[in-house]
Design a protein with these regions (language model features):
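Acidic-enriched, low-complexity/disordered segments with a strong bias for Aspartate over Glutamate
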Residues: 1, 53, 89-91
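Long, non-catalytic architectural segments outside compact domain cores
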Residues: 1-46, 96
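Short alpha-helical segments used as structural interaction elements across diverse proteins
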Residues: 8, 51-52, 71
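Generic secondary-structure transition motif, activating predominantly at the C-termini of alpha-helices
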Residues: 23, 27, 55-62
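Short amphipathic alpha-helical heptad-repeat segments
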Residues: 43-56
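Short, compact, well-ordered microdomains
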Residues: 57-96
Length: 96
């Protein structure tokens, strides 16, 4: 379950707080197409998997103190990941 994955991820509180602040201005269409070359028409699980993979790569770079690590991109990915997880959770709770 990919939504469980998000809840088990341990990241610095400052990154999570910044990502949560980003939820206020998160624009799904713009974010997915501009930053991640993802389509809103893709299955939500595909989008979530892509975001999880990208966040994992960024976190690895952060931990290795890689010179090309981009904290702003990391926050953007975390924001999208949180927003998309909430969207899936909301869809799963809607009656059929």
């Amino acid at each position: 379950d990919m939504t469980f994955h998000l809840h088990s991820v341990k990241r610095p509180k400052i990154l999570i707080n910044a990502a949560n602040l980003g939820l206020e201005t998160y624009n799904r269409a713009t974010c997915l197409s501009s930053f991640f070359a993802l389509s809103m028409h893709q299955h939500p699980a595909q989008i979530l998997r892509s975001l999880i993979d990208k966040e994992g790569q960024l976190n690895k770079m952060r931990l290795q103190q890689h010179v090309q690590y981009n904290i702003a991109l990391h926050v953007t990915v975390l924001t999208a990941l949180i927003a998309e997880t909430k969207e899936i959770d909301r869809d799963e709770k809607q009656p059929i």
